[in-house]
Amino acid sequence: LKIANSRGHLIILPWMGQMIWDAQFDGHGLTMCNMFRQPKPATEVIETYGCFAFHSGLLANGCPSAEDTHLLHGEMACAAMDEAWLELDGDMLRLNGRYEYVMGFGHHYLAQPTVVLHKSSTLFDIKMAVTNLASVDMPLQYMCHMNYAYIPNATFSQNIPDEILRLRESVPSHVNPTAQWLAFNQRIMQGEASLSTLSQPEFYDPEIVFFADKLDAYTDQPE
């Protein structure tokens, strides 16, 4: 499904996890370079890893270790949606969806993702609401996973302090680090290098990951 305004468009897969396949605004493609010419039928996101954004989780998240049994980035990424519909509300176009996960003797929840496109704007909203329908607590591990295009010399900014960003020190099993990548990570940990500007692409493959926790202690609305 392609939804558009005067500034650009989104291509969305309403029936597969409400994945956003592509995003283009003001003549700029926002999606990372990848090998996929089009979406592929998939049950795991790695089988169609060319999208701009997807909902990662919900019962489990991230890269499974040897001891884990969950799919890469969880069951929601490629979930077969039960319902999808469009709503027009003033200057907004909203794509809604519903997915009910139920497993005998297991978890039961309702996921309701939403994408909102605004009139004459390059900003759009990605939302997710989750309701536990079981009689017991459920684990919830959610991430809105964005795959942005690499922009040379782009800069990062945020309204949280730099010192709360923590570098991931573990190396997942699917990552094959190079010697220069390991050395660059060590320089970051020692305070000798930073990633405020994307000016050294040779050091960013594999990806470099930072964590931040308890953001509400610093701002009501992290940006």
Model-flagged regions — what are they?
Residues 1-125, 136-139, 148-223:
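Surface-exposed acidic/polar loop and edge beta-strand patches at domain peripheries
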Residues 142-143:
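Structured soluble/peripheral alpha/beta segments that form catalytic or ligand/cofactor-binding pockets
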Residues 129-130:
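Hydrophobic beta-strand positions in extracellular immunoglobulin-like domains
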